[in-house]
């Protein structure tokens, strides 16, 4: 079973990210992934994330969003985690603005693996103590380490 810590890197874990709007956050996600993985085009990632949002918001409540999409040319899942400097409206189910985002990009053919990763993220973020730890992470490295620690039962 693939685990979140296997597809997330410290370089794709960011704190104090300027938000502004849902669209701007999705652009920043696309640019972040394309910067670290230049084989992917930021505009394509952005368009796929926007298309997925049009199907229904990935804002799940409690200030959390899990933007995700399938991506042509993607061979294995890619994740990122961002803590925004200020919450943004993400059309979340509970109406609350979002400040914590877990991103999941998967191959076009991904099915069960994609769903398993979404389950892992949702289960982790369902815990108030984990959300508090993530929100209080002072650095990108600390944010990444919290995800790893939680995945390892700490």
From Swiss-Prot:
Q: What is known of its domains?
A: The PTS EIIA type-2 domain may serve a regulatory function, through its phosphorylation activity.
Look up the record and give one Gene Ontology term from the biological process aspect.
phosphoenolpyruvate-dependent sugar phosphotransferase system
Q: In which compartments does the protein localize?
A: Cytoplasm
Entry-linked InterPro entries: PTrfase/Anion_transptr, PTS_EIIA_type-2_dom, PTS_Nitro_regul, PTS_SugarTrans_NitroReg
- Which parts form a coiled-coil structure per UniProt? none
Q: Which GO terms describe its cellular component?
A: cytoplasm
Name of the molecule in the record = Nitrogen regulatory protein
The molecular function terms in GO held by this entry are: kinase activity; protein kinase activator activity; protein-N(PI)-phosphohistidine-sugar phosphotransferase activity
Active-site residues annotated for this sequence: 68 (tele-phosphohistidine intermediate)
Q: Which organism is it from?
A: Pseudomonas aeruginosa (strain ATCC 15692 / DSM 22644 / CIP 104116 / JCM 14847 / LMG 12228 / 1C / PRS 101 / PAO1)
Q: What's this chain's function?
A: Seems to have a role in regulating nitrogen assimilation.
Q: Which NCBIfam families match?
A: nitro_reg_IIA
The record places domain PTS EIIA type-2 at 6-150
Q: Does the keyword Cell membrane apply?
A: no
Q: Which domain of life is it from?
A: Bacteria
Identify the Pfam families for this entry.
Answer: PTS_EIIA_2
Q: What keyword terms does UniProt attach to this protein?
A: Cytoplasm, Kinase, Transferase
Q: Which Gene3D superfamilies does the entry link to?
A: Mannitol-specific EII, Chain A (3.40.930.10)
């Amino acid at each position: 079973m693939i685990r979140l810590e296997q597809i997330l890197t410290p370089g794709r874990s960011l704190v104090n990210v300027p938000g502004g709007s849902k669209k701007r956050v999705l652009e920043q996600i696309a640019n972040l992934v394309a910067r670290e993985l230049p084989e992917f085009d930021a505009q394509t990632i952005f368009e796929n994330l926007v298309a997925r949002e049009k199907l229904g918001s990935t804002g799940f409540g409690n200030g959390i969003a899990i933007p995700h999409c399938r991506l042509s040319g993607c061979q294995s899942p890619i994740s990122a985690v961002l803590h925004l400097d200020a919450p943004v409206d993400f059309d979340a189910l509970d109406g609350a603005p979002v400040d914590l985002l877990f991103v999941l990009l998967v191959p076009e053919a991904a099915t069960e693996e994609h769903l398993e990763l979404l389950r892992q993220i949702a289960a982790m973020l369902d815990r108030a103590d984990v959300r508090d730890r993530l929100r209080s992470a002072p650095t990108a490295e600390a944010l990444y380490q919290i995800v790893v620690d939680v995945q390892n039962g700490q």
